[in-house]
Amino acid sequence: VIGGDECNINEHPFLVALHTARXXRFYCAGTLINQEWVLTAARCDRXXXXXILGVHSKXXXXXXXXXXXXXXXXXXXXXXTYTRWDKDIMLIRLKRXXXXXXXXXXXXXXXXXXXXXXXXXIMGWGTITTTKVTYPDVPHCADINMFDYSVCQKXXXKLPEKSRTLCAGILQGGIDSCKGISGGPLICNGEIQGIVSYGK
């Protein structure tokens, strides 16, 4: 997250860190949507990944953090068909149901789409500097606004006329998602409205 601040430790009980199983390296984020499923981006598909729930600082292992092995990943269609603006969505089923605790709880799924101009938050352990990659130990949060899709379409000429992607950000720039935050949630009014796919 560029231009954000450290998230409050109580602010993200649904935020999941995805690690590569072998190198135990953090590479993506996800959102716990119930005791058995984590919602993330299709680009975060890895052969063997471990989902870590209830983690705040990557440096200090809290007793509350629980590592869960993934049982199966379900992508929207043949995983090869996702693009930066379509079907970049995946569900990871946990091998065993996660016990809800203060540090790990599910995010409410959105009942209705967020209106343009609504304020939402993005969060994750992605890089916090643009010139070089600087991964923080604790997740960063940033407030951004929802926009009409046409606003993003004007900014990124490659976007198709119709898309299932949401458009969000800050028009004056300076606040954005960045490398390593993919798969993390877009939260509006405490509900998950989207999944971070890419920032520009």
Curated annotation (Swiss-Prot):
Main location: secreted
Domain Peptidase S1 span(s) in chain numbering: 1-200
Site (Forms a covalent bond with the inhibitor PMSF): 182
Keywords: Disulfide bond, Glycoprotein, Hemostasis impairing toxin, Secreted, Toxin
Comment on pH dependence: Optimum pH is 9.0.
PROSITE patterns: TRYPSIN_DOM
Cell location: Secreted
Biological-process GO terms, alphabetical: proteolysis
GO terms, molecular function: serine-type endopeptidase activity; toxin activity
Gene Ontology CC terms: extracellular region; secretory granule
Matching Gene3D superfamilies: Trypsin-like serine proteases
Entry annotation: catalytic residues: 88 (charge relay system), 182 (charge relay system)
PTM characteristics: N-glycosylated. The protein exist in multiple isoforms.
Reported tissue expression: Expressed by the venom gland.
Protein purpose: Snake venom serine protease active on several blood coagulation enzymes. It completely cleaves fibrinogen Aalpha chain (FGA) after 120 minutes, partially cleaves Bbeta chain (FGB) (overnight) and has no activity on gamma chain. It does not release fibrinopeptides A and/or B exclusively, since the enzyme does not provoke fibrin polymerisation. It also degrades fibrin as efficiently as plasmin, and exhibits potent ability to cleave plasminogen and prothrombin, as well as heavy chain of factor X (F10). In vitro, it cleaves insulin B-chain (at positions His38-Leu39, Ala40-Leu41 and Tyr16-Leu17).
Subunit composition and interactions: Monomer.
Protein name as annotated: Snake venom serine protease VaSP1
